[in-house]
Amino acid sequence: EVHDAVKKVIETTGQTMVVVEHHIDVWLDLVDRVIVLGRPDADSQAGAVIADGKPDEVFAQMGDVLAAGGAWVPGRAIPDCRPDDETRGETVLSTENLSFGRGTALGTGINLDFHAGEVTALMGPNGAGKSTMALTLAGLLKPIDGKVLIADSLKPPHAGQEPINWKSKELLGRIGMVFQEPEHQFASNFVRDEVAIGPKSMGHGEDEAYQTANRMLEQMNLTRFAKANPYTLSGGEKRRLSVASMLAAAPKVLVMDEPTFGQDFSTWTEMVKL
């Protein structure tokens, strides 16, 4: 819809368009020129123009270089990041006749099982209730009706099976949530401290917590921002930080709302592998 609306405006008015995009495929029929910026190196905050020309020429001549540098190159296959062992484990999270929504039910009578070691994709158009259902599964939004239940083996001592009734510290290390808007979960003034919150809250020592934080920052290509304020990062960097923060707490169940949005090819691949 966005593509078609933009195309109509260009055809009608002859306006010049500059589009900033990781996934250029959808715009190729409208694009006359492609400019590719390189990733800044460790000693510099600035990148440089590494390719500039007609789309066919740029991708034909520099496709391998661009792919190696992390760009999404049209026609390139996405790597298979599935684990070698796809055996389904025990049921760790389930729903019983779940109705979810914010006042008005967006879904009713839902019965689902989620297994250890299994990755489930929740899909649907805008407004279908994906984010609302994700918050409900993570124990952060009360169901309208029915239940979200966690396995007996994962529930806190002296607590029931419904995560919505748990305290925040009881959710930690059991169910993690990566929000659609990363800023909603930031609680520190520095990136490194943000990632260390989970391990610290779980009782890990200072050294261990920051070792975990350093490892996660490296895996997410965020090490050079360790002393930066989370709110100064780009949209894609904020999203990687929110994922790193949740992974640092090693939850048994991880619910992520559009975690790879705004990522280039290399950061997308690294996040999916994790």
Predicted region positions:
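Conserved beta-strand-loop-alpha-helix hinge in the C-terminal portion
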Residues: 40-70
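The feature captures the beta-strand-to-loop junction immediately N-terminal to the Walker
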Residues: 123-125
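H-loop/switch region of ABC-family ATPase nucleotide-binding domains
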Residues: 21-22
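Conserved ABC ATPase "signature" region
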Residues: 207-225
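Helix-to-loop junction immediately C-terminal to a conserved catalytic motif
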Residues: 138
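Conserved ABC ATPase signature
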Residues: 229-233, 237
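Catalytic Walker B motif of ABC-type/P-loop ATPase nucleotide-binding domains
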Residues: 254-257
